[in-house]
Amino acid sequence: MTEYLLSAGICMAIVSILLIGMAISNVSKGQYAKRFFYFATSCLVLTLVVVSSLSSSANASQTDNGVNRSGSEDPTVYSATSTKKLHKEPATLIKAIDGDTVKLMYKGQPMTFRLLLVDTPETKHPKKGVEKYGPEASAFTKKMVENAKKIEVEFDKGQRTDKYGRGLAYIYADGKMVNEALVRQGLAKVAYVYKPNNTHEQLLRKSEAQAKKEKLNIWSEDNADSGQ
């Protein structure tokens, strides 16, 4: 619709210019010719104002919701709203399995969840056995989720389950992200980062850098060189 109005405005401008030309050629013929000249000039000015307004409106509509009508995304708008696309969903705790795994009741069904973007030392691995700081990580997660009045899960933009059928999500205990809390305490590393399931990657890396700086738990001097 805007395109048609713009075309009509351009036609009006052309007609106004022609009218001004006619008025100029007849301006010496009397008072009526002068009035005609002023009228034509006013029409041209008004037309130009309308065309300018319509042009601005058309440009604004091209980037509605961060997506151009041509199909390409506006990166500025997209980056500002990308995290808002994630949303938290309610769940209830069944049990904490280990540092990075919990079992929840989700949408009326029991489901095991693997915390996204983090890896804690093992406690129940068939080959690795119990690793250093594994029990501490398990106890930390257990305390967070068992003491919470509200548990929520937040899926990212990619796949929601792994090959074992476990849900891949960020887990929140009373609004605090368990994934990030583990990393901040030096009880988990940032790991298994696969786009687009990495919305909170930078948050976790910032917490990991701080835990390293403070040499917390797996980043302590005794374990820093061992890859723990």
From Swiss-Prot:
- Catalytic residues in the record: 114, 122, 166
Instruction: List residues binding Ca(2+).
Output: 100, 119-120
**SMART domains to which the protein is assigned, alphabetical:** SNc (SM00318)
Signal peptide span: 1-23
Keyword terms of this UniProt record: Calcium, Endonuclease, Hydrolase, Metal-binding, Nuclease, Secreted, Signal, Zymogen
- Pfam families associated with the record: SNase (PF00565)
Which is a Gene Ontology cellular component entry for this protein?
Answer: extracellular region
Q: Kindly list the places in or outside the cell where this protein is found, as annotated in its UniProt entry.
A: Secreted
Stretches with biased composition (Polar residues): 58-70
| Function description | Enzyme that catalyzes the hydrolysis of both DNA and RNA at the 5' position of the phosphodiester bond.
Q: What is this protein called?
A: Thermonuclease
Q: Which organism is it from?
A: Staphylococcus aureus (strain COL)
